[in-house]
Structures are given as structure tokens and as C-alpha cells.
Amino acid sequence: MGMFVLLLYTFLYAGDLGHGAEKSFPVLNIAVILGRTRYITERDIRSLWTRDMSLDFDVNVVTLLVNQTDPKSIITHVCDLMSGTKIHGVVFGDDTDQEAIAQILDFVSSQTFIPILGIHGGSSMIMADKDEMSTFFQFGASIKQQATVMLNIMEEYDWHVFSVITSNFPGYRDFISFIKTTVDNSFVGWEVQNYITLDTSYTDAQTLTQLKKIHSSVILLYCSKDEATYIFEEARSLGLMGYGFVWIVPSLVTGNTDIIPYEFPSGLVSVSYDDWDYGIEARVRDGLGIITTAASAMLEKHSVIPEAKTSCYGQNERNDPPLHTLHNFMINVTWDGKDLSFTEDGYQANPKLVVLLLNMEREWEKVGKWENKSLNMKYPVWPRITASLDSDHDDNHLSIVTLEEAPFVIVENIDYLTGTCVRNTVPCRKYFRLNNSTTEGTSVKKCCKGFCIDILKKLSKTVKFTYDLYLVTNGKHGKKIKNVWNGMIGEVVYKRAVMAVGSLTINEERSVAVDFSVPFVETGISVMVSRSNGTVSPSAFLEPFSASVWVMMFVMLLLVSAMAVFIFEYFSPVGYNRNLAQGKDPHGPSFTIGKAVWLLWGLVFNNSVPVQNPKGTTSKIIVSIWAFFAVIFLASYTANLAAFMIQEEFVDQVTGLSDNKFQRPHDYSPPFRFGTVPNGSTERNIRNNYPDMHQYMVKFHQKGVQDALVSLKTGKLDAFIYDAAVLNYMAGRDEGCKLVTIGSGYIFATTGYGIALQKGSRWKRPIDLALLQFVGDGEMEELEKLWLTGICHTEKNEVMSSQLDIDNMAGVFYMLAAAMALSLITFVWEHLFYWKLRFCFTGVCTGTPGLLFSISRGIYSCIHGVHIEEKKKSPDFSFTASQTNMLKLLRASKNIANLSNLNQSQCNSPKRTSDYIQRNSLLTDMVLDKGNLTYSDNRPFQQKDIYSENTYDLAMLSANCPKDNLNNYVFQGQHPLTLNESNPNTVEVAVSAEAKVNTRPRQLWKKSVETLRQTQGSVNENGTEESKSSIKNQRFLPEDGHFSDVSEASSRATCHIDSENNNKHRKSKDNLKKRPVSAKYARECSEVELSYLKIKHGPNRDKVYTIDGDKEPSFIMDQPKYSENSPDQDDEDYPDVYQDHNDNYRKTEPLQSDRTPLHSEGRLPNNDIQYKLFSKHYNLKEKNTSMSDANDRHRQNSTHCRSCLSNMPNYTGHYTARSPYKCDDCLHTGKLYDIDEDQMLHEAANSMHSEDFYEHNWLENNALHFQKKNKLRINRQHSCDNINKPREHDLGRPPRSLSLKEKERYIQENPFAKFVIVPPEKLLGNNASLFTDSLKDSKRSKSLYPDNSSDNPFLHSYQETQKLSHGRSSSDIYKQSSLPKARNDNYLRSSIKSTTSYSSRDGRVPDDMCVSEYALPYVTSNNSVYSAPRVVNSCSNRRVFKKMPSLESDV
């Protein structure tokens, strides 16, 4: 029993808990009240709401459909509903346009604090003033919001001038106030003409009077729907409802869209809440969602839903609503992804508004939408709809279509700040389709300007019309496709536009469909190309002049000017070549064609090159004229060079549409690419005239001009064909001016732009007259300057200087590289020709005269008038008696010439002279390439036949004379030339020894022997080595008398005979000036081997020391360079006089042949005197006497005869100086030189056999040679400045006297004069001379001056580096070898090595090799045969010649 009671209690408790929990779940009751005009049932309304499981309360929807919507019925239904059910919110909608319903609902909400939503009809209409306690919300827009949309519509269509008409309906003050505030604070140029408020309670007369004040075409109306009917009726009577007037009203006037009063005009614009896209069902659902969302937010925040008022009846208490009432949460609501918020006035914050238009069918048409504060209109141009009751229509407002194409029509966006178009632009509409599948889209307001827009504005003012402008939809000018026109032409043809203004080309096809005005712009077809960066050609440095100019320049230079200069100079009486021919300036420079070309070439390019200017007056005139030409030529070249070295931009050159690049584009690589914009006059022209060209260019068509410009710049297109006016503008405005039109805008198929009008339009004539007036007044020209002229056409690009890169100068470097390569080839060919081929060209290979030799000889013969005789080979025949005698005579002459080459020991040798003649090389043999005493390669001498070339020997005697640089010559005048058959390249010249005038004396040699005798150092008495001798040593030796060196047997005359003829050729120089080292020393010196002579069976071989003359000289003369162990020569038999008693070779030092007993080395004073003795560098043995003993031997008071060297005791001059006096025996001839000296020498030689001769002299002088080996020798001073190094034995010697007329001046002015006038007491000692032999019996021959040929190119002349056959070189003073001691059975042997690189063609000793005179004593017996050295001028490069016996005198 107890258990049953417990279970029952448990069930009951659980049931109580469940019942209590169910009561605690809140319920939200919402009432939906709708008028029965709507076809909707209560079930439909309940089905709109489904339970939302996310809510914490239950929603109970209470529906009520009413038939009566008058204010009393509405209040009754709402109060009854509230009394039966606790209502938390009400959703109310009706089908009326009575704003009184909204006012009643506003009153009920303020009394019951129940939130009420007016979603449709009168409940949603505008209320002017709501109660402060009102909780009434409306699905609609406020007065301010609708006024904003109305202003945006006027701004969209640029209706800036308007008027405002209102009634006394509540809210009109708010409407007027908002309009005024917006206009005053806006950047748009609004202009409100009138604000009119009509009182509809008064008579019609007052209303009409106020309406007459309106003059604007746009009117804003604010009133109720009933009042609007009255006002429209009155306005119609005043003509304010006609064509061109626009009325804009709010939703208050429109009301129920299903009810349209008759008085409403067609074209009425209304701003209403969106009923088309926002139906009653959607509004009911959104109303329920707003209330439930707000209740949920309140329950979440306060955990309670406030109890609603249960009855409308009772005491009216005006208490403030609680702070947590439901309507406070309904202000900011977002539901189902929609923003359903409300403003404080109870209107939606973002309402969906639409723009309605009452069309011709008297139906409301949706033409615009306002959403998210943005207005989108349907029509680009507002349709001018005329009311059906209007009798007349206004045709002055035109619809005009245009096409965007700069500079004629330029489209810009509106100003974002003002929302309108700026000044100088007009509004235009651009239509955008929503998608390609439908024609629906929206129009966007744009701003248009340009050349055609300015013309349109002028026409509008002149012709008096207004217009709406819009852009063509397909962006084309107009083309007929399948009998349907598109583009602007289609708009005009199908009367959607009255006219078309833009870059519309007039053509025949279009003229059939539309009418065109007169052309206002001349245009046609042009071609645009892009500039491309060019490259500089390698030959750009030649491009300043054309090829013909360069050819003419070289022709004038080489063939005309140079030849003329040469010819006039050659035949000029004062020219170079004439002076050579007449002998006025022998050996002087000649003026050749090459020098003429070089002179003119240097003048052209202004190079400072050494040139030889002509002397002739005529040739100087030609050169002066050429110099003037060179100035102009070089200036023109320099001025134009910079332009051609700059990288010019490359532009494709096209001559026209018929150009090959257009007609045959595949002929070019890559193919030429060109195109145009389709559906235009340009394409039509090309298609009709050039079908093949059109077929090719279709694949390169461009969508527009801008796309074409981009393709040109990026290289996708090579040329763009289009209207010339457009292309010229684009080229002028292009950034960087990279785009150009060919031919500076050359036009093909000239035509013009015109305005298209409908066929038979009444506007054609007025527009034509206006356009002609613009052209005549110059207004059209001003517009063209403003719009059609670009910056690239008016402004010149600034020329910027830039560095010339390697690319700019590549051509010049290529030329230099080619010149270097050509030089290398020429260098190789020159050496190949010189070493391998030239012998064949000169005839050596064939044995006959070569081609070059024959041509050169012929030219020389023609120029100089010299007859050339071909010397034929002598036939074999037996000699007659006279011929035999002549051969003997020639043989004797050769023997005589050879005897002069013998030294003292050879003359005193017991051997016969004929032995020397046969064994040794004769003078003429050496001339005839018969070799030297010993060949340089130690080959034995090969004897040549001397009989076949006797006459040739004589000719070669003079040929060996080198050229005289001072123009002294022997062979003057014209001489016959004969060809030597044995040597085909040698020409013989007949020589005359007769003296000629115009010869010139030699100058005084500046160098003294003391300077030449510097050596390694000096050894003082203590044996210490002193420093090298300075260059400031004694430089002058006393010379002979005035003409001591001028031989009467010489073949030239002295200068004092005809000195006046030579003054112009030679100027006196200050010979004491320091000269450069290159002038003081020779450019070459032969290498002399100074060796000991060896005996044939001698067991010992001494070392051979060689002085290398090729070493480069220095200013301070270094010691000679010696080379040991030079290759020995082949042994030969020498005379016995060269061996000592023990058969040893040169055991003691031999007596120097160039010393005299009078001038021994021991005659110098003590060491404090400036003259010092130095041992000879080739004296290897110890000396037999000391230095002090040697000095004592030199003191004496006597002198000698300068000719015969005999003793003259009364001479008080310098004891070391050569005597300037002659003895009485030598003065009897009265001549400077007597040929008898040579005869005496030869007679003496013939009076004694050679063996006895040598033996006799040796026995007589043997003791003297051993005692006097240290005596000072007297040498003839050698000339030439090219002396390399002094000899040791010449150092410290006193100077010789000077010769010629400058002797006194040199002695006075020379800084070394003190050495010449040293007091005798310092030079003479007490010791007597060791020698008492007299010199009176001795005779010495003087040498001749060198006699030079007159530069005959066919005579062998010898270089400065080559030895002379009968004279001495400039370095012979170093080459005086000492004589060996007196022994029998030894032959003289010497080895000579030439330092020149020249070698004869047969590989033997060079032709120019000669033997220096090694043993030439100054003091000999009466029978001595010798030849004295002589001096040559130091200012020239003359050689020293030995005295040769006169052939004519001997014969």
C-alpha cells in the first residue's frame, strides 16, 4: 500500500514538472491585416511563415482580411483583434492610394506602442509628420530620398534648369527645403527658376497665374494624387504639357500604379517604390521576419518579451514607453541576407526605388532603377513623348548618333566630384549590354568632346536646335551586310537618329542610303608605319660624299692635279729637276709624281706630314688652288660626317597602295604585314580596287585605331592603312613620335568627312550653309589647329648629342684592319721579291738586261738625253800589234795602281813587285768583283781574266766614289753610256779629268784626332787607371796651308775659283756648336779584326782581338769591345820580314808604320802637362821604355817639311804640330801638288828589285824602329763624323793645325785653342832628340779630294757602310795595323770583315769591299812607295780616297 502511494506521487510530480515547463515557453503573436482587393487567402498568408527551429519562442501568425479600408473600419478591426489576442506586432497592407491610412496607423501605434509595418498601398505612403511616440514603420522612401532620385535623373540627362511646384500637402516644406539645400551645396550647375506653391482651394485663375511663371522644360511636382490631377489640367491649358516638357513626380503623386488618371501626361516620370520586383507576398514575409528578428534580439538581451496592451479601450494614459520596447530592436535588422533597416523616421534606410515612365500606351514603364545609391537608366536619350492631345510637335530637339574616334570624337568619364560633364564637353550615352545573348543592357553617361563635337555645338547655336547625343552601339561607321546597314549609317537609315556626326567618310555607297552635308575635313587613305632603331653602316664614314664625288676627288688628285704639278715643276726653269739637269744643284732632291701626290694628299686631309713643296711658280699656283679646294672638301666632309654617324631610325618606305610591299608582300622576308579597320570606307576602297590585297590583309584587320597603334609599336603589324586625318593626328600625338605617316601624310583616294542626315531631311540645307560659313570665317581652320595638329608636327625634337660608340666608327676600324692586312701582304711580297725574284727581273738569271733595267735605262736616257750604246760581246780574234800594246799599257796601269797599296816593308822586301801583283788582289780586281786579299769566309782567291775587262776597270775606278752630299761631283755634263755585256746591269761612263767650275771646297773637319783617340782609360805614372777621357779633349790639329789638301791633279776645281756660284747652295755654319750624338758618330763602322799574323809552321796561335764597330755609340766614348778567338784565316806564305830571328810570330811589338822618328811618344812633357801618352790597345807585349823616358825623347826645337818631311831647324812653333812650311826643294814647282811625286815613286820602285829594296830599307831603319816604337806618330786626320770610338794610341796627343781659310778663326774662337798655343817652354824639355835623321829626302804624296759622279743611277756607287777601293772609310783611323818585325819569307795578311748586311750576288766578298791601308809610314826612304791619308769635311759624309796615279799623265 505504501509503495503504491509513492509511485503515484512520483508520476504526479513529474506531470506537474512537465506542465510547468510547457507554460514557460514564450509565444510571439503577429497579426497580418490585408485588404481583400488582393487575391490572397488566409492559408496563403500562414504558409508564408515556417517555424524556425533556431528561435527560442514560438511564432503565432494571426491573419485578418478586411473589406473596408476606411479609417473607421481599420481602427475597429485592429482594436477588436487586440482585445481577443495579445498582439506583439502588426503587418498591414492595402490596395488604396489613400495616405490617410498611414496617418491612422501612425496614430494607433503611438497609442498602443505596438509596432506596425505598412507594407503596401496607402499604409506605405509618405507622411509629413509622425507622432513622437509612433512605432509605425513603412516600406517606402522618405521625401528626401525621393527628391534625391529626382535630382539624379535630371543630372543624368543634363537637365540643369528646372522649376519646383508644390501644394500644401503635408511634407511640401521638407521637399522644398531639401531641394534648395542640395542645389546650393552641389558642384553641378543647377539652376532653379521658380519655386511655386499652389493652393488648390483657391480659384483656377490664381493657379493659372502662378503656372505662367514657369519657363523651364523640366518641372518637379510635389502634391497628392488628386491635387496632381488638377494641376496637370491647368498646366495643359498653358502649354506646359507639350513636346519637350518633362514632369517629374514622387510616389505620392503616382499612388496606385493600377489607377492612372486621364490628366496625367504621356512622358510623365515618377519615382516610386519597386512594386514590380517586390510583390505583396515578399513584403509580408519580410515583415514577419523583421518582427521575429527584433523579438529574438530582445529576448536574447532582456530574456523577456514585453506584454502587449490587451485593449484599445480604457483610460488614456500618456506614459512614456519602456526603454526595452520591441520597436527599438526593429531599426537595425538584417534578415535573409537583406538589409531591412529603418531610419528614425520609420522609412527604409535603403529602399528599392524605380523610375517609371508613362508611355504612349498610357502604361507605366520601368525605365530606371535606384539601388545602393546608384541610378541606372534604360534610355540613353530621353524619349520625347508627345501627349495624344497635343496637336503640334516640336522638331527642334534632335537625336544625334556619333562614334568615338580621336580627335574627332573623344569620350571621357564624368567628373566623379560633380557627377556631370566638365566644360567644353557634352553629355553622351554609351550603351552596355548585360550579356551577348540578350539585347538588354544599361546606358552609362559619358562626356564627349573633339573636333566634330565642337562643330556640333556651333551648328546647334547657328541652326537653332537641341540634341541628345549617344554613341553607336556596334562602334562602326556603317556597312551594308545582307542589305542591312549597321553602325552610324544604320542608325540614320532606320530613323533612330536624325543625323550622324563624326569621322564619317563620304563615299558612293553611303550616299545612296543617306544624305551627306558638304565635307568639313579633307581626308583620304594614308599609311602609318612605326620607326625602328636603325644601325650605322660600316661605310658610314664614306657616306658624306657619294661614290661619284670620291671617284672625282681621286681622279682630280692623281690624274689631273698631281700630274699638272709634276709637269709644271719638271719644266720650270727653277724647279728641282731642271736644276739637276743643268747641273745647278747636282745630287739635290728631285720632284717626282709620287711626291706630288703625297703633297696634295696631305693638303686634302690637313696632315702635318713632311712634304716637298715645288719651286716653280706655276706649280705653286696649282698647289694653292688645290689647298683652297681641300679646305672646302674637308669642311664639307666634317660637317656631314656627324649626321651619317648617328644611328638614324629606319622607316619602311611605301609609295602607295600599288607598292610592291602591298601587292606582293610574300616577296619580302619576312612577309610584309598590313591591315585596317573593317566595315569602313578604307576597306571598301581596297576591296573594290585591290581584291588580292584585300584578301591578304583580312587576317591582319584591327578592332580599332588604338589596337592598330599598339600592334605597330609591338611589331605585330608593319603598316596600318586608314583615314589620313585620323592617322595624321595619331602620328602628331604619339608618345615618343615613333609613328609616322608615309610621305608626311600623303593621301591616296582623296575624299572628305561629312554629316549624315536622313533622306530628304529639312536640316541638310541649313547645315550646309553653316559649314560653309565656318570655313569662310576661318573657324574651321582654328578648329583644325586645335584638334588635328599634334606635338610631333609642331615641335621639333631636341637633338641630343651622344657619344660615338664602336659601332659608329666600325667602318674606319675595318679600313685600318684591311690596311694592316694589306701592309703585311706587301711586306712579305717585298722581301720575297728582294731576296728571290728581283735577280730575274734585273737579268741575272738570263744573263741579259732585265726588263726593269731596260725600262729604267730608257727613261733615264730620254730625260737626260744620254745616248746608250749596246755593247756587244767581242768576237774571238787575234790581237794586232797595236792592240797588244794597248793591253800591255792597261796591264801596266793596273800594276801602278796596285803598287800604291804596298806598305814600307813590302817595298823593301827582296821579293819582286810582280809577286805581290799576282798574289794579292789588285785595286782594279777588287773593283771588278775579284775579291779582297782574303775573303770573309776564308775561301782562296780565284784569279779572273784581266784581259777581257781592261777598259771596264778604268770606268769602275770612278764608279767606286760615293755620292757627295754636298753636291760635289766629278762627272759633269752629259756622257755617253755603254752597256757592259759581262755585267748587264752596269753602264760604263766616259770620264774626263778636266776640272770644272761650280765645284765646292770641303769644309773643315771639326773633330780632332785627340777626340778619336779616347780609350778605356789612361795609366798614370803610378800605374793607376784614370777615368775615361772627356769629350772636351783637344779637337783640332794644325792643318796644312790654304790649299794643302787640294790636289792639282784632282778632276774638280777648288771653290775659291767660283765661290759666288756656290754661295746659294751652301751657308757657313758655326762648326763649334755642339751637335747631337747621331751627328758626331757614324751610323755604321766596319768590324776590323786586329790580329797577330801567324807564320806558316808556327806552333803557337795567339788570340785574335776584334773591335765590333756595329755597337751603338754613346756620347761618352766607351772602351772598344774586343772579341776573343775570332776565326783564323787560312795560312798563307808571308815574307820573311814579318818573322823574328827565332821564327816566332811577333814576339816583340813592331814599329808602327804611322809613326815618325820626329814624333815619337817619348817627346811629351811631364805628367802635369795636359798631353798624356797611352799605350795602344793592340800592343799586348810590355814596352821596352818607361813613360818618363819616352817623354824626354820628344823635346826638340825643329820641324819638318809638310811635303817631303825633311828637317827644318829654325821652326819655333809647336813641336808636335805638323809643319805648315815646305822646304826649298818642294817650293820650286809652285804647285800644291806635283804629279812628279807619283812618277818619282814609281821610278824609285823600278830602280831596285823588290827584294833588294826591302832589304836595303830595313837594314837602314831597323835600329830606329826598335828604338822609336813609343814616338808620337803623325796621322793625316780622317774626316766624317761617324767615327765610333777612339784608339788608345791616339789619346793624349797634341792637336794638329787646321787647314783651309778657317784656320785662324778656329784657333781664336775654338775653346780648345789653348791646347794649340801652349807655350813652348812647357812642351820642350832639355833632352835632345834621339833621332838625327833628316827628312829632307823623304817625299810624301797627298791624297785627292773624292771625285763623285753626278748621281748616275747606272754606275756602282757604294754605301756609307762599304769600304772604298782606293780610299779610306771614316773609321780607317782605327784600322792602322802595325807592321811586323823585319823577317823574310812572310807575306802580308790581314782579315777584314764588313759590317754591312750587303753581300754580292755570287756569294763572295761584296763588290764594294776594299783593303784599308795598314802600313803607311810618314817617314821613309827616298824609294818608299806610300800613300798618305787625308781629311774630308766633317759636315758631309765624304769618303777618303788615296792618291791614284793619273792615267792620262802616265800614258
UniProtKB/Swiss-Prot annotation:
L-glutamate binds at S503, T505, R510, S681, T682, D723. Zn(2+) binds at H120, D258, D274. Residues 1011-1022 have a biased composition (Polar residues). Residues 593-612 dip into the membrane without crossing it. Keywords: Calcium, Cell membrane, Disulfide bond, Glycoprotein, Ion channel, Ion transport, Ligand-gated ion channel, Magnesium, Membrane, Metal-binding, Postsynaptic cell membrane, Receptor, Signal, Synapse, Transmembrane, Transmembrane helix, Transport, Zinc. CDD domains: PBP1_iGluR_NMDA_NR2, PBP2_iGluR_NMDA_Nr2. Residues 591-612 are annotated as: Pore-forming. Glycans are attached at N67, N332, N372, N435, N436, N533, N679. GO terms for biological process: calcium ion transmembrane import into cytosol; excitatory postsynaptic potential; long-term synaptic potentiation; protein heterotetramerization; regulation of synaptic plasticity; response to zinc ion; synaptic transmission, glutamatergic. Disulfide bonds join C79-C312, C421-C447, C428-C448, C737-C792. It is a multi-pass membrane protein. GO terms for cellular component: NMDA selective glutamate receptor complex; plasma membrane; postsynaptic density membrane; postsynaptic membrane. Pfam families: ANF_receptor, Lig_chan, Lig_chan-Glu_bd, NMDAR2_C. It catalyses: Ca(2+)(in) = Ca(2+)(out); Na(+)(in) = Na(+)(out); K(+)(in) = K(+)(out). The chain crosses the membrane at residues 548-568, 618-637, 809-829. It comes from the Eukaryota. Residues 569-592, 613-617, 830-1451 are cytoplasmic. SMART domains: Lig_chan-Glu_bd, PBPe. Residues 1011-1080, 1100-1165 are annotated as: Disordered. Residues 1-20 form the signal peptide. PANTHER family: IONOTROPIC GLUTAMATE RECEPTOR (PTHR18966). Component of N-methyl-D-aspartate (NMDA) receptors (NMDARs) that function as heterotetrameric, ligand-gated cation channels with high calcium permeability and voltage-dependent block by Mg(2+). MDARs participate in synaptic plasticity. Channel activation requires binding of the neurotransmitter L-glutamate to the GluN2 subunit, glycine binding to the GluN1 subunit, plus membrane depolarization to eliminate channel inhibition by Mg(2+). NMDARs mediate simultaneously the potasium efflux and the influx of calcium and sodium. Contains an N-terminal domain, a ligand-binding domain and a transmembrane domain. Agonist binding to the extracellular ligand-binding domains triggers channel gating. Belongs to the glutamate-gated ion channel (TC 1.A.10.1) family. Heterotetramer. Forms heterotetrameric channels composed of two GluN1/zeta subunits (GRIN1), and two identical GluN2/epsilon subunits (GRIN2A, GRIN2B, GRIN2C or GRIN2D) or GluN3 subunits (GRIN3A or GRIN3B) (in vitro). In vivo, the subunit composition may depend on the expression levels of the different subunits. This is Glutamate receptor ionotropic, NMDA 2A. The lineage of its organism: Eukaryota, Metazoa, Chordata, Craniata, Vertebrata. The gene is grin2a.
